[in-house]
Amino acid sequence: MHVPIRLLEWFKVEQTLVIQKKKRFGFSQGIGITLLIAIVAKYLAELPFLNIMGQLVIAILIGMVWRAAIGVPHDAIAGTNFASKKLLRFGIILLGMRLNLVDIAKAGPKVLVIAAVVITFTIFVVYGLTKVFKVEKKLGILTACGTAICGAAAVVAIAPQVKAKDDETAVGAAIIAILGTIFTLIYTLLYPVLGLSPYGYGVFSGATLHEIAHVIAAAAPGGSAAVDIAVIVKLTRVAMLVPVAILIGLWFGKSEGSKEKRSWRDLPIPWFIFGFLAMSAVHSLGIIPEVVAGYIVVIAYMLIAMAMAGLGLNVEFKTFRKLGSKAFVAGLIGSVCLSVLGYVLVYALGFM
């Protein structure tokens, strides 16, 4: 009797080991797919037209195409989910190395004013429009914040605050990416007739466009003077992601009517955002050489691109059509309003 029992125990152990090995392989496969997509997206983003879209946008689109054309193995989903959540947060922390708080301070209070005004205005207008078009609440918030602050990075940073699903996050990021690309092309065509100096045009681009890649591409016709100030204005908007994320979390929790008692640990504070600020402070103090900081930013974008790929791999095109059409229209109208406001503020604040 002892032999069969031992054989049964051995069989169970072997079966457990096989299952664990299969899970580890599936996890590694999921991570590998997102890494491959992120690398391909990086090189595609260096091509003449695709550089307008940027690595993050291309990664999420490739992910969606991959799912539609090839599919994602069931065991690999754990890896793609890990990339879209855990690696995302680590990437956002490292992205803080892109931000130099000293440069923002040198730009003066008017830059802070224009950033604060456009963010506040855009969140209210775009979210209001999504309600008019009967867009799902969480997707409406993500669309509003992505338009107002910093595109896909804002969408994925705000998503945990409103408990958004992966498909809502992916659709929100894709909408903002497409809108930003459209408006980048429009800005480039309109630059000669806007009547703005290179400096003023840079402020206008940085204050109103969605992604950093969009801002750099749109400001390029104005030369280095336009690009430099455009990036500073844009990064000022990025810096406001922290307070906006906290406020959105508090508002969403209250609007959902949660009456449970919460400790300070339960406050809707995206703790990884403080890592982002800490990295910004390190960069601002000049502790890390610029060359090293540049490499860290490249790694940050690679990690976030892997997260974008993971999101894309979790959403189908039919889901995008179902959830995204009305949100896209709301974002489009809101982006037009944002552009008009930005243009007016450039003149009103004397940035011409």
Swiss-Prot record:
Protein's name according to its UniProt entry: UPF0324 membrane protein BCE_5279
Entry superkingdom: Bacteria
Signal peptide: none
UniProt keyword annotation of ATP-binding present: no
Transmembrane feature ranges: 25-47, 52-71, 111-130, 140-162, 169-191, 201-223, 230-252, 267-289, 291-313, 328-350
Organism listed in the record: Bacillus cereus (strain ATCC 10987 / NRS 248)
Pfam families to which the protein is assigned, alphabetical: Cons_hypoth698
One annotated Gene Ontology cellular component of this protein: plasma membrane
Location of the protein in the cell: Cell membrane
Membrane topology summary: Multi-pass membrane protein
Entry annotated with the keyword Transmembrane helix: yes
Keywords for this protein: Cell membrane, Membrane, Transmembrane, Transmembrane helix
Family to which the UniProt record says this protein belongs: Belongs to the UPF0324 family.
